[in-house]
């Protein structure tokens, strides 16, 4: 796909990366890609950790338009959503994301607010409140 679209100078596949090294690689990316085939409810309804990694790094991303991604994107506008994982959709989405500087800058800026809201420090408060209510 990379060679067929002459993107060797723009796309670098790093292979397997140790979790401890992932953040230092992620912050160097221009755009993130969070794509899963719709081959079951698990993929269709879940949110990938990398989705949040890109947000925390302030990196706009390309995501397939599944409900959880759409819901967060409607709130924060941090990703370009594509209808499916066909080659044409991925190529068109990436080209659009990479060529529209205004969109890219807006998504990048929006990641800041999303990062402030979507993190463990905020989720911890919600979880503690939940348990306090549960315990009465």
Question: Predicted segment positions?
Answer:
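Short alpha-helical segment that forms part of, or immediately flanks, the ligand-binding pocket
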Residues: 20-23, 45-57, 67-71
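Conserved donor-binding/catalytic loop of nucleotide-activated donor transferases
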Residues: 27-30, 51-60, 64, 76, ...
């Amino acid at each position: 796909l990379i060679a067929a679209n002459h993107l060797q100078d723009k796309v670098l596949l790093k292979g397997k990366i140790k979790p401890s090294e992932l953040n230092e690689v992620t912050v160097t990316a221009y755009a993130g890609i969070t794509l899963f085939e719709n081959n079951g409810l698990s993929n269709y309804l879940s949110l990938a950790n990398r989705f949040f990694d890109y947000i925390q790094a302030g990196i706009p991303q390309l995501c397939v338009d599944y409900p959880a991604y759409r819901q967060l994107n409607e709130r924060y506008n941090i990703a370009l959503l594509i209808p499916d994982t066909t080659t044409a959709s991925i190529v068109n989405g990436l080209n659009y994301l990479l060529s529209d500087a205004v969109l890219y800058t807006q998504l990048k800026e929006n990641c800041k607010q999303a990062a402030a809201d979507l993190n463990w420090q905020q989720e911890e408060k919600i979880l503690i409140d939940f348990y306090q209510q549960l315990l009465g």
